[in-house]
Swiss-Prot record:
The keyword Manganese applies. Coiled coil: none annotated. The keyword Transmembrane does not apply. Mn(2+) 1 binds at residues 10, 348-349. It is found in: Cytoplasm. NCBIfam families: deoB, PRK05362.1. This is Phosphopentomutase. GO terms for biological process: 2-deoxyribose 1-phosphate catabolic process; 5-phosphoribose 1-diphosphate biosynthetic process; metabolic compound salvage; nucleotide metabolic process. CDD domains: PPM. Belongs to the phosphopentomutase family. It comes from the Bacteria.
Length: 408
């Protein structure tokens, strides 16, 4: 019986890529800098303190690939010689450092074209597009239309939105258009329908914005605004066939998507999508789906909180806390991996919480492989995340993917 479990620790980069200078990210190192701040006692909030303690991830080879990736030692990390997994680290060949690019490349469909972006920090979405959306969606207008972080935009426009019911539109250096609306006053269903309509408008005009993101929030005063777990991403469809589509098409297999995975691939190559938000719920859902998984199944999960709650908000303590929680609970998952099963833990980009700004960082990612029948081996540097997709294709005896080289 062949089952694969693909876990993405969203934004868990391990050092700048060779082209990081193009992004202003030379020196970025999500894992390394979190470890450094913990070592310096600069990450002692949320009830955690001191050195970063993640022994189970280290037992899969994390420290070894992190040092190889960055060329620097890890402060406060005591590595182990008792490595039970195999390991590698990978460069990204996609043009961007965004969620869609990283995930599509993992699945064997790197983004070698340029996304469209709303690069102007003010009046970001052009007037003609705003008018299109307003007319077709029967709106009175938008608030914002600028570059902003999710928390800042609510501080600035949340109360005005409540009184006017005008959606809040904002973007960033990523290929995204984000729409924030109050979950009850504007309505969750109405927000989703608005984002679907924007997706259709952009697609019709051949505007390659990767994701339209619905960002519902609650609260009635600035100090009480909170984004909820009901975020939805309305993505473009992958431009190339993914390994998940091959598994379904060639083996009549199943792909169980947990959390935001289905949204990232616009539902393509997904058999079943399991709704879950928050680190604990995502982990528990993953455990349950692994227990239920049959032959020729991929269980695919993204742990988004590392990125959305801690990376973008530049919160080192929160990132460290959740890494330690994940590591503490990882043995529960490892014991469910049968002899023929394949577990891969990786990331889609970096988001160094010690870095300037609030955006992703262009970084290499770890590829931690656990298979009971495999002896521990260092598979070294990989040129593309698509080596993961090619490895899965070989594992399931599928036809060869267009990109990537099987890791083993």
């Amino acid at each position: 019986m062949k089952r694969a479990f693909l876990i993405v620790l969203d934004s868990f980069g391990i050092g700048a890529t060779k082209d990081a200078h193009r992004f202003g990210d030379v020196g970025a190192n999500t894992f390394g800098n979190i470890a450094k701040f913990c070592f310096l006692n600069k990450a002692n909030n949320y009830g955690r303190k001191g050195l970063l303690y993640i022994p189970h991830l280290l037992s899969l080879g994390l420290a070894k690939v992190a040092i190889a990736s960055s060329g620097q030692d890890l402060l406060g990390i005591q590595d182990t010689n008792n490595v039970i997994g195999s390991y590698a680290y990978s460069n990204e060949i996609s043009s961007g450092k965004d969620t869609s690019s990283g995930h599509w490349e993992i699945a064997g469909a790197p983004v070698l074209f340029d996304w469209d972006y709303f690069s102007s920090s003010l009046n970001s979405v052009p007037k003609y597009l705003i008018q299109d959306i307003v007319d077709q969606c029967n709106l009175s207008g938008f608030l914002g239309n600028c570059h902003a972080s999710g928390t800042d935009i609510l501080d600035r426009f949340g109360e005005i939105h409540i009184s006017t019911k005008k959606p809040i539109l904002y973007t960033s250096i990523d290929s995204v258009c984000q729409i924030a609306c109050h979950e009850s006053i504007f309505g969750l269903k109405r927000l989703y329908n608005l984002c679907r309509s924007i997706r259709k408008i952009f697609d019709k005009r051949k505007i390659n914005i990767a994701r339209i993101i619905a960002r519902p929030f609650t609260g009635f005063k600035k100090e009480h605004f909170r984004r909820t777990g009901n975020r939805r991403d309305f993505s473009m469809e992958p431009h190339k066939i993914t390994v998940m589509e091959k598994l379904i098409g060639e083996k009549k297999g199943r792909v169980i998507a947990i959390g935001k995975i289905s949204d990232i691939y616009a539902g393509k190559g997904i058999s079943c999508s399991m709704y879950a938000t928050g680190l604990v719920n995502l982990f528990n859902t993953t455990i349950q789906e692994i227990k239920n998984a049959k032959n020729n199944t991929i269980v695919f999960v993204n742990f988004v909180d590392f990125d959305s709650l801690w990376g973008h908000r530049r919160d080192v303590s929160g990132y460290a806390k959740d890494l330690e929680w994940f590591d503490y609970n990882l043995p529960k998952l490892l014991k469910l991996v049968h002899n023929e099963d394949l577990l891969i833990i990786t990331a889609d980009h970096g988001c160094d919480p010690t870095w300037i700004g609030t955006d992703h960082t262009r970084e290499n990612v770890p590829i931690l492989i656990y298979q009971r029948s495999m002896e521990s081996k260092n598979f070294g540097y990989r040129e593309t995340f698509s080596d993961i997709g090619q490895t899965l294709a070989k594992y399931f005896n599928l036809s060869t993917m267009s990109y990537g080289t099987s890791i083993f």
